[in-house]
UniProtKB/Swiss-Prot annotation:
Domain remark in the UniProt entry: The N-terminal domain does not have lytic activity and probably modulates enzymatic activity. The C-terminal domain is the catalytic active domain.
Molecular function GO terms recorded: peptidoglycan lytic transglycosylase activity
Enzyme class name: lyase
Role according to the record: Murein-degrading enzyme that degrades murein glycan strands and insoluble, high-molecular weight murein sacculi, with the concomitant formation of a 1,6-anhydromuramoyl product. Lytic transglycosylases (LTs) play an integral role in the metabolism of the peptidoglycan (PG) sacculus. Their lytic action creates space within the PG sacculus to allow for its expansion as well as for the insertion of various structures such as secretion systems and flagella.
InterPro entries associated with the record: Lysozyme-like_dom_sf, MltF, Solute-binding_3/MltF_N, Transglyc_AS, Transglycosylase_SLT_dom_1
Species annotation: Salmonella paratyphi B (strain ATCC BAA-1250 / SPB7)
Membrane topology of the entry: Peripheral membrane protein
CDD domains linked to this entry: MLTF-like, PBP2_YfhD_N
Protein name according to UniProt: Membrane-bound lytic murein transglycosylase F
Catalytic activity: Exolytic cleavage of the (1->4)-beta-glycosidic linkage between N-acetylmuramic acid (MurNAc) and N-acetylglucosamine (GlcNAc) residues in peptidoglycan, from either the reducing or the non-reducing ends of the peptidoglycan chains, with concomitant formation of a 1,6-anhydrobond in the MurNAc residue
One GO cellular component term noted in the UniProt record for this chain: cell outer membrane
Major site of localization recorded for this protein: membrane
GO biological process, any: cell wall organization
Length: 514
């Protein structure tokens, strides 16, 4: 019996050694790879995305974007660095997953039944609808029934293609479209804006952000209902990455981080006003250049473009603006506030901007330290508009109604209640025009988004023009004449061949003499 046991032990050890040697060559070995362990061993989370105002963008060397900030937080959660790769279109994103060049796709992608057959979706964090857009002043289609491929162009890999195919089969048999393999949704939106393209389809949030900079972009109709947005990873037997994503999103949902980031990028509202936005951008071109140095000089700790947006909301950048209540100037300061700040002339542009900036800094300093850094400005602006005491009442009301007093998303929803007697009668400082403070802050945020995007667009155009000038520098006639093939000499020698008829330039000489 003892010998038999020894033989079994030997066979067992031999079997284990053989299995260990053959393990990497077993066909399903790759499927059991621990994705999280691989990411942490590499020390880098590889994320592919698309360059857009919502997902990922770089402004003055600083990175922004809803998906970028979430991806950075997830990388921190895993204890690794973040590597972002920007692709031109959705099709290229999924190519990165297929080739193993990306761990995650974080680009505002929509959950779709066709996609989840081949890729693993993550938690859903907001929703969008797909909309058909056109340029203001052009024909607006009221239905997809008459839209054809000569008018409608879609980016490759766009989820709406599946919806269009279903609509073609069930409702609109004449519906057709074209897929441009070389362009992404952002480029196609720009071509609709410029008039090069009749229609394209994009998600409602991206369109809303584009309209802040390009008010001539208009929505013709909704192509789909609301659809959830999610991240995607490879679909296999290893669920470690999916589990980590679920834990991560649960944690940022519980601590309020997700709500703050969504408020930052999605909280600007969707009540787009074409006339107001167009008027604002005209003022950016015609009025702002004179005031810009003053905004930059006195902005200090806040973004000068935010200070400029506040001033436009207050006075439309009119130094002589006066309200029925007596507030005056670019920053619409009261007489008492101006005196407390040592100002002598509220209609003087520099005094008004410097005073308004200092008053806003005072409001920010009063905001409780429990409020997150990136949301303090909104509390300060509400206090700037309706008074600090009423802002405290709004926080108190938020607590009483089971909200978070440190969350701007929660507090701003209670602002309109400050003018309703059942609520203000129970507050310390009573009645306030909370609905006006709500609109005030929301308008400033919209102007800031428009200003940042518009200035970024102008910088991009100027950079492209400069590069074009460098690649193709202007040449004077004198420089041309010094060239190996002197241009002026050629013209003088060829004058006998130049006629009013272009066709005669290439007529043989003998035929001309004949």
């Amino acid at each position: 019996m003892k010998k038999l046991k020894i033989n079994y032990l030997f066979i067992g050890i031999l079997t284990l050694l053989l299995a260990a040697a053959l393990w990497p060559s077993i066909p399903w070995f790759g499927k059991t790879e621990n994705h999280i362990a691989a990411i942490q061993a590499r020390g880098v989370l590889r994320v592919s995305t698309i360059d857009s105002p919502l997902t990922y963008s770089v402004i003055n060397g600083k990175k922004y974007g809803l998906d970028y900030e979430l991806a950075q937080q997830f990388a921190n959660y895993l204890g690794v660095k973040l590597k972002v790769t920007v692709r031109q279109n959705i099709s290229q994103l999924f190519d990165d997953l297929d080739s193993g060049n990306a761990d995650l796709l974080a680009a505002g992608l929509v959950y779709d039944s066709a996609r989840v057959k081949n890729y693993q979706p993550g938690p859903m964090y907001y929703s969008v609808s797909q909309q058909l857009v056109y340029r203001v002043g052009q024909y607006r289609p009221r239905s997809l029934a008459t839209v054809n491929e000569n008018q409608l162009t879609i980016a490759p890999g766009h989820v709406v293609v599946n919806d269009l195919q279903r609509l073609k089969e069930t409702k609109f048999p004449d519906l057709s479209w074209k897929v441009d393999d070389k362009k992404g949704s952002t480029t196609l939106l720009e071509e609709v804006i410029s008039g090069k393209l009749d229609y394209t389809i994009a998600d409602s949030v991206a369109i809303s952000l584009f309209q802040r900079v390009h008010p001539e972009l208009a929505v013709a109709l909704d192509v789909t209902d609301e659809q959830p947005v999610t991240w995607f990873s490879r679909l296999d037997d290893d669920n470690t990455l999916s589990a980590a994503l679920l834990d991560f999103f649960n944690s940022i949902n519980e601590d309020g981080s997700l709500a703050r980031i969504e408020e930052k990028y999605l909280g600007h509202g969707d009540d787009f006003d074409y006339v107001d936005t167009r008027s604002f951008l005209r003022a950016v071109d015609n009025v702002l250049p004179e005031l810009e140095p003053l905004f930059k000089k006195y902005a200090k700790e806040i973004d000068w473009r935010l200070l400029a947006a506040i001033s436009y909301q207050e006075s439309h950048w009119d130094p002589l603006a006066t309200s029925p209540t007596g507030v005056r100037g670019l920053m619409m300061l009261t007489k008492n506030t101006a005196q407390s700040l040592g100002l002598t002339d509220r209609t003087d542009a520099e005094q008004s901007i410097s005073g308004g900036a200092r008053y806003l800094e005072d409001m920010m300093a009063k905001v409780p330290e429990t409020v997150p850094e990136d949301e303090r400005i909104w509390f300060a602006l509400a206090a700037y508009n309706m008074g600090y005491a009423h802002m405290l009442d709004a926080r108190s009301l938020t607590v009483k109604t089971k909200g978070n007093p440190d969350s701007w998303t929660d507090v701003k929803q209670r602002l309109p209640l400050l003018s309703q007697k059942p609520y203000y009668s129970k507050l310390t400082y009573g009645y306030a025009r909370g609905h006006e403070a709500y609109a005030y802050v929301e308008n400033i945020r919209k102007y800031q988004i428009s200003l940042v995007g518009y200035l970024q667009e102008k910088e991009k155009q100027e950079a492209e023009a400069m590069k074009l000038a460098q690649d193709y520098p202007a040449v004077s006639p004198e420089e041309l004449n010094k060239a190996p093939f002197p241009f002026l000499s050629f013209l003088s020698q060829s004058s006998g061949y130049l006629t009013h008829s272009p066709s005669l330039l290439f007529t043989p000489q003998k035929k001309e003499e004949k």
